[in-house]
């Protein structure tokens, strides 16, 4: 069945999959952002000076401070560093995930999925292309971390051995620099693996979401409506109209729509009468039927909400257009005449070229 899934996923399929948590996301990229942000914060703002200051105060007071006061002070300093650190980690993990998912929350992924306990499905995942990809990725990561460790060892081995004669503060400063250097070197060595994994994950996700032609057709019917039902609906609309109304539509110069609730037909033949007349006057379902029939017989339908409402309020069928509205109606008639004449002028030279 999967071999028949050759069509690209539709926008609706991608949105539904994102709600289920099945959209493209590179977990390693999220972990890399989280690690980099956390280490950068600890190296930049983490310090033992405040903790050491508390100890100095206690010693200066001849240990008169109670254990409760000391614990409370240490707890306050810990919160001062821990809360921003946790918020930063939350942002560094959530923002890349939301960007990859198009800011769609996977609400349906929170529901329990009993099919995940199916041993057959587990066996399929065990021998899938994604498992092969993860195995190769793990080996590449291991190689890149070994390379990063070798680079850091060759570059910082002097600093490492110099700590044998250093004090506590000096050792803390050196290890802070070494930690940042090790993380940055590992990320730099693993950058290519990260990009390759993201590309492979994207193509595997798109492959899993591919649809067969029947699924695409079924989804189009759900979104746009079944063509057979739409055709039947048009036929019903036609049956709503009487033969007199159909005749009035055919003789109209144009139909002014609102765009679905009101349709007003304009009859205008200067050789018979100099003033336009209201030939069609329908609302709601009959208005939709008028539009459908006008499009069928080739009568222009112009959407002008303001004019349609005004004519509907002030006129009835077979009324002559009043002086208050005649300017707007004549403007539409002149514009329509110009458009039709321009179309004829384009067609005429083409016919002459064919004859020559």
Curated annotation (Swiss-Prot):
A GO cellular-component term linked to this record: plasma membrane
Family statement drawn from the similarity comment of this UniProt entry: Belongs to the type III secretion exporter family.
Lipid bilayer topology: Multi-pass membrane protein
Subcellular location: Cell inner membrane
Example of a GO biological process term: protein secretion
Organism domain of life: Bacteria
Protein name: Surface presentation of antigens protein SpaS
Predominant subcellular localization, coarse grouping: membrane
Transmembrane segments: 29-49, 72-92, 132-152, 179-199, 261-281
PANTHER family (UniProt xref): FLAGELLAR BIOSYNTHETIC PROTEIN FLHB, SURFACE PRESENTATION OF ANTIGENS PROTEIN SPAS
NCBIfam families: FlhB_rel_III, PRK08156.1
InterPro entries named in the record: BsaZ-like (IPR006307), T3SS_substrate_exporter (IPR006135), T3SS_substrate_exporter_C (IPR029025)
Keywords for this protein: Cell inner membrane, Cell membrane, Membrane, Transmembrane, Transmembrane helix, Virulence
Gene: spaS
Function as written in the Swiss-Prot or TrEMBL entry: Involved in a secretory pathway responsible for the surface presentation of determinants needed for the entry of Salmonella species into mammalian cells.
């Amino acid at each position: 069945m999967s071999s028949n899934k050759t069509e690209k996923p539709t926008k609706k399929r991608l949105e539904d999959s994102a709600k289920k948590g099945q959209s493209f996301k590179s977990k390693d990229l999220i972990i890399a952002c989280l690690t980099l942000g956390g280490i950068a914060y600890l190296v930049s703002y983490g310090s033992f000076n405040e903790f050491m200051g508390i100890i100095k105060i206690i010693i200066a007071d001849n240990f008169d401070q109670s254990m409760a006061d000391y614990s409370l002070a240490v707890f306050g300093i810990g919160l001062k560093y821990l809360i921003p650190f946790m918020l930063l980690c939350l942002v560094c993990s959530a923002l890349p995930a939301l960007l990859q998912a198009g800011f769609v929350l996977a609400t349906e992924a929170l529901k329990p999925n009993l099919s995940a306990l199916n041993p057959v499905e587990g066996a399929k995942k065990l021998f899938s292309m994604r498992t092969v990809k993860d195995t190769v990725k793990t080996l590449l990561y291991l190689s890149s971390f070994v390379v990063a460790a070798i680079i850091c060892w060759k570059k910082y081995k002097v600093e490492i051995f110099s700590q044998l004669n250093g004090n506590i503060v000096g050792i803390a400063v050196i290890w802070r620099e070494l930690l940042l250097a090790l993380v940055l070197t590992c990320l730099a060595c693993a950058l290519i693996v990260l990009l390759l994994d993201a590309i492979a994950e994207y193509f595997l996700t798109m492959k899993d979401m591919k649809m067969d032609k029947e699924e695409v057709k079924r989804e189009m019917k759900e979104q746009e409506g079944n063509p057979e039902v739409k055709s039947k609906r048009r036929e019903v609309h036609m049956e709503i109209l009487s033969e007199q109304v159909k005749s009035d539509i055919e003789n109209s110069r144009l139909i002014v729509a609102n765009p679905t609730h009101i349709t007003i037909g304009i009859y205008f033949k200067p050789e018979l009468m100099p003033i336009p007349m209201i030939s069609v006057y329908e609302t709601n379902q009959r208005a939709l039927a008028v539009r459908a029939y006008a499009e069928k017989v080739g009568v222009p339908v112009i959407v002008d909400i303001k004019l349609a409402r005004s004519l509907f309020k002030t006129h009835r069928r077979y009324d002559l257009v009043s002086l208050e509205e005649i300017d707007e109606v004549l403007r539409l008639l002149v514009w329509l005449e110009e458009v039709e004449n321009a179309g004829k002028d384009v067609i005429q030279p083409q016919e002459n070229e064919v004859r020559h």
